[in-house]
Amino acid sequence: MLYKTIVLLFTLMCSLLTAQDQVKPKYDVFSFDKQVTLPGTPEVIFDAVTGDISGWWDHSFSEHPKKFFIEPKPGGGFWEIFDDEGNGVLHSTVIYADRGKILRFDGPLGLSGKAIQVVTTYEFESVGSDSTLFKVSVHAAGEVDEGVPEIVESVWNHFIFERLEPYIKSGKHLIKN
């Protein structure tokens, strides 16, 4: 009986120690919306934010990525290509594409390695005859560390207002390589 009690206490202590050593991730949800009016038709702006986006997308897993590319079709990838050998990252997968109207992709983007689902939607709305209201909606659910929602929103502010908007207004998206 004493042996069984000792084994039971030992097992209980080990399970308590193991439980204390394990840090359970925090699960949460967050979302936000951004918008900016850009010069160009919805189709022109759609084309500028798909295909090769290396001219304005600047957050990467690689120190010197070769290319960022969004394939604007269902099942297409949002790729970061590291080098000529094809090493890289699939940041997300396109789940809805309608040129000049909507692009939606599902994937963790910079949160790769976490148990998180991030759905990002681009919407394109004509403003007058030569401008587009570009709307970005981000919805996320899953493993979310403290401060991550604010960081992700800040990064999107950077992409939209510090990178994409000046890129479009400079006309660089119209220069074909």
Predicted regions and their residues:
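Hydrophobic pocket/interface hotspot
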Residues: 45-49, 78, 94, 105, ...
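Short, highly charged C-terminal tails/helix-capping segments
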Residues: 67, 165-177
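Hydrophobic ligand-binding cavity/cleft-lining segments
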Residues: 16-65
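Beta-strand/loop substructures that line and gate deep hydrophobic ligand-binding cavities in soluble
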Residues: 107-158, 175
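Bacterial Sec-dependent N-terminal signal peptides
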Residues: 1-22
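Hydrophobic/aromatic beta-strand elements that line small-molecule binding cavities or substrate pockets
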Residues: 34-36, 68, 90-96, 118-126
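Short beta-edge strand/loop motif at the mouth of beta-sheet-based domains
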Residues: 53-89, 176
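A short, structured loop/turn motif at beta-sheet edges
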Residues: 39-43, 95-102, 123-133
